[in-house]
Amino acid sequence: MSNILAVFNPPPQRELEKEETMDCVPCQVMSTMFSVGFGSYLASGKPFKYGKKEAKRGISLTEFEKRNPQWWKVTLRSFGGLLIAFGFVRGTEGWLWHKNKEYKNYKKLSNDGETQAN
């Protein structure tokens, strides 16, 4: 069944195994990088800088300020700060706190074609 059809006709519910719900190191690294990176972008205020691109499109500075009111700027910058904090919390989980956390074990293919557990 295709993924699109699965939205309208979902498969029956099933119990997930522990291995399926465990966190993995690559997932943790990617979520940390995304959170810190995008949070830094939002917190820096760069999305609200009037530049050549807006001037070229014919948007004046006053029109640009109308499209980005102060409450919107503060909200997104605050959300950026929260994303940065979440990224650091997520990134330090497992080695600074919650040290007994278990991660998924991946099997990789060795040179001779046999699978090995990491």
Swiss-Prot record:
Q: Which InterPro entries match?
A: Mitochondrial_unc_protein
The entry's keywords? Mitochondrion
Location relative to the cell? Mitochondrion
Q: Tell me where it mainly resides.
A: mitochondrion
The yes or no answer to whether the keyword DNA-binding is present is no
A GO CC term assigned to this protein in UniProt: peroxisome
* Domain of life the protein comes from: Eukaryota
By sequence similarity, the record places it as follows: To S.pombe tam6.
Q: What is this protein called?
A: Uncharacterized protein YDL157C, mitochondrial
Q: Which organism is it from?
A: Saccharomyces cerevisiae (strain ATCC 204508 / S288c)
